[in-house]
Amino acid sequence: MEGIAKITLILLFLFVTMHTFANWNTEAAVCVYRTCDKDCKRRGYRSGKCINNACKCYPYGK
């Protein structure tokens, strides 16, 4: 029973860590002007623009 609890805690820790860092950086490595806005919208952001050769996604809000 104690082994199952340890495994569950380890899996929970890994899941939370992966989920936290999955959207850590919302900038793509190279910006393609035609697809930047589409890619950002597909990921759940309001819009996207190419800034300094990087696709910057803008969230909903102000």
Swiss-Prot record:
Query: Which residues are annotated as site, described as Basic residue of the functional dyad, important for the interaction with Kv1.2/KCNA2 channel?
Result: K49
> What keywords are annotated for this sequence in UniProt?
Amidation, Calcium-activated potassium channel impairing toxin, Disulfide bond, Ion channel impairing toxin, Neurotoxin, Potassium channel impairing toxin, Secreted, Signal, Toxin, Voltage-gated potassium channel impairing toxin
Per the UniProt entry, the disulfide pairs are C31-C50, C36-C55, C40-C57
Q: Name one GO cellular component term.
A: extracellular region
GO function term, MF aspect, one:
potassium channel regulator activity
Chief location category: secreted
Site-annotated residues for Aromatic residue of the functional dyad, important for the interaction with Kv1.2/KCNA2 channel = Y58
- The chain residues annotated with the modification Tyrosine amide are Y60
Q: Where in the cell is it found?
A: Secreted
Protein role: Blocks Shaker B (Sh) and voltage-gated potassium-channels Kv1.1/KCNA1, Kv1.2/KCNA2, Kv1.3/KCNA3. Also inhibits small conductance calcium-activated potassium channels (KCNN) and intermediate conductance calcium-activated potassium channel (KCa3.1/KCNN4).
What does the miscellaneous comment read? Negative results: does not inhibit Kv1.5/KCNA5 and Kv3.1/KCNC1.
What is stated as this protein's family in its record? Answer: Belongs to the short scorpion toxin superfamily. Potassium channel inhibitor family. Alpha-KTx 10 subfamily.
Name of the molecule in the record: Potassium channel toxin alpha-KTx 10.1
| Species of the source | Centruroides noxius
